[in-house]
Amino acid sequence: MEGWQRAFVLHSRPWSETSLMLDVFTEESGRVRLVAKGARSKRSTLKGALQPFTPLLLRFGGRGEVKTLRSAEAVSLALPLSGITLYSGLYINELLSRVLEYETRFSELFFDYLHCIQSLAGATGTPEPALRRFELALLGHLGYGVNFTYCAGSGEPVDDTMTYRYREEKGFIASVVIDNKTFTGRQLKALNAREFPDADTLRAAKRFTRMALKPYLGGKPLKSRELFRQFMPKRTVKTHYE
């Protein structure tokens, strides 16, 4: 793939004394691993551009799993993330690195990612609605199809006041037992609309996406979540990540 592509750096690490190993998310090729030769040298013009949350145009090539970066241009300055929104951005970057296979095209997801980063950059309140929408979009692109609006058992539309439990490969069925794996019809409608007007629907969305993403993430904890707990105030951590 030698043409220019829109891209974002998800993660980078040193690779030899003068080069970087990049994990990037591109519009056409999906997630790609690149070597940026000379990017760490003092004279490199790429060093400042190859950072997370900077919209890029990249050109790369090669036949192996690890491609070689040919050229890179920053489309604009990095989107301004700091504090909670920075850790939120690191979280979705790590999420993509953990669940996406290399060189699988996800063009629509690329724009979902861009929209999420833009929403985080412009957030004046909690970043959680943007995170939940992105997680739901990611699940959809991974093939995790869920019907939030109908009871799988009866075929009837979900009722706001009833409780439902999710069964894999079946959907939501009515439940008389209420626990952390059940959802009200009102919460399911909010998930379907991807609109979370209050704390109740936001908490429900977080419960569902964590449950749904768990098989993709396995038992390995997310580093971004641990960093958030380590560096942000305890009250903030509990509000946004517990």
From Swiss-Prot:
Keywords: DNA damage, DNA recombination, DNA repair. One of its GO terms (cellular component) is bacterial nucleoid. It comes from the Bacteria. Pfam families: RecO_C, RecO_N. SUPFAM superfamilies: ArfGap/RecO-like zinc finger, Nucleic acid-binding proteins. The keyword DNA repair applies. GO terms for biological process: DNA recombination; double-strand break repair. The keyword Nucleotide-binding does not apply. Belongs to the RecO family. Monomer. PANTHER family: DNA REPAIR PROTEIN RECO. Involved in DNA repair and RecF pathway recombination. This is DNA repair protein RecO. It comes from Shigella boydii serotype 18 (strain CDC 3083-94 / BS512). The gene is recO.
